[in-house]
Every structure is written in C-alpha cells, then in structure tokens.
Curated annotation (Swiss-Prot):
This is Large ribosomal subunit protein uL10. GO terms for molecular function: large ribosomal subunit rRNA binding; structural constituent of ribosome. The keyword Glycoprotein does not apply. It comes from Edwardsiella ictaluri (strain 93-146). NCBIfam families: PRK00099.1-1. GO terms for cellular component: large ribosomal subunit. Belongs to the universal ribosomal protein uL10 family. InterPro entries: Ribosomal_uL10, Ribosomal_uL10-like_sf, Ribosomal_uL10_bac, Ribosomal_uL10_bac_type, Ribosomal_uL10_CS_bac.
C-alpha cells in the first residue's frame, strides 16, 4: 500500500517520539517468520514494555538522524523490524534473543545503547543486563554477605584474643 506524504510524516513523528524516550533499540530481519509467531512476539513485547514496528528503511533513517540511535543507520537494509526498550535497556534484546532461538529465520541485525552500536554477535551484552530489581537484589546480597563476613572475622579475632589471654 502506497503511503502519502501525510502518512509518512505521521509515522516519522510517532516513531521519533518513541525513540526519544527509549533506552535502547534492536533491529531485526523478520523475513520468513509466520504471522502467528510475529503476533506472539508483539504480544510478548507489549508485556515487556517494548515498542515494535516495521517501518520503511528511508523513514527509519529520518527517525534516527541526530538521535542516540544514529549508529543504526547502516542496518536499515531489507525488511526491518525495530524494537525500542522503554522501561529496561535489555528488554528488547532479551525478547529478540529468545525469539531467535526458537525461530531460525528470525535474524537480529544489531542493537544500540547509549549511542553505541552493538553487533548481533555481541547482543548478549545488552540482553544480560540485570533489571533494576535484579541489580538491587544483587547489591543487597553483596552487602549482606560482606556484613556476615565481617562478623565472622570479628568473632574469630575475639576468639583468638581470648585464647591468647
């Protein structure tokens, strides 16, 4: 279906607005994936706070121009599905990585985080970022472990001091 100028401007405006609030972006080629599988992916994306859209490459180049995602310009070749992570930087990468594992025809092209291009081979860097809750839990576990270790060392020092006396 041909898009007129107003439709193109509306798409660019919508996706640009989403890109401004996004933490990261992932670009993939969804050629050969069934409609049912894509529907499942979109549903999982909505639940994970990921905005997904298939947009013409020329329009996507306009969207990313001057933004933190400008490094993705060269990946807009062929059928392109773009996903913006709105709540957590690794959400879209995790979603696409898991989907690609189950669907051989789905290919992740690249990702962008804080203006840095992350090639598809290194997508794990972004996908394995802990969520805010996971990071807090790890920090608390480390702090708790350090306090317990300090207590054990203090008790051992007291024991050694009493044995020496």
């Amino acid at each position: 279906m041909a898009l007129n100028l107003q439709d193109k401007q509306a798409i660019v405006a919508e996706v640009t607005e989403v890109a401004k609030g996004a933490l990261s972006a992932v670009v993939a080629d969804s050629r050969g994936v069934t409609v049912d599988k894509m529907t499942e992916l979109r549903k999982a994306g909505r639940e994970a706070g990921v905005y997904m859209r298939v947009v013409r490459n020329t329009l996507m180049r306009r969207v990313v121009e001057g933004s933190q995602f400008e490094c993705l310009k060269d990946t807009f070749v062929g059928p392109t599905l773009i996903a913006f992570s709105m709540e957590h930087p690794g959400a879209a990468a995790r979603l696409f990585k898991a989907f690609a594992k189950d669907n051989a025809k789905f290919e992740v092209k690249a990702a962008a985080f804080e203006g840095e291009l992350i090639p598809a081979a290194q997508i794990d860097r972004l996908a394995t970022l802990p969520t805010y809750e996971e990071a807090i839990a790890r920090l608390m576990a480390t702090m708790k472990e350090a306090a317990a270790g300090k207590l054990v060392r203090t008790l051992a020092a007291l024991r050694d001091q009493k044995e020496a006396a």
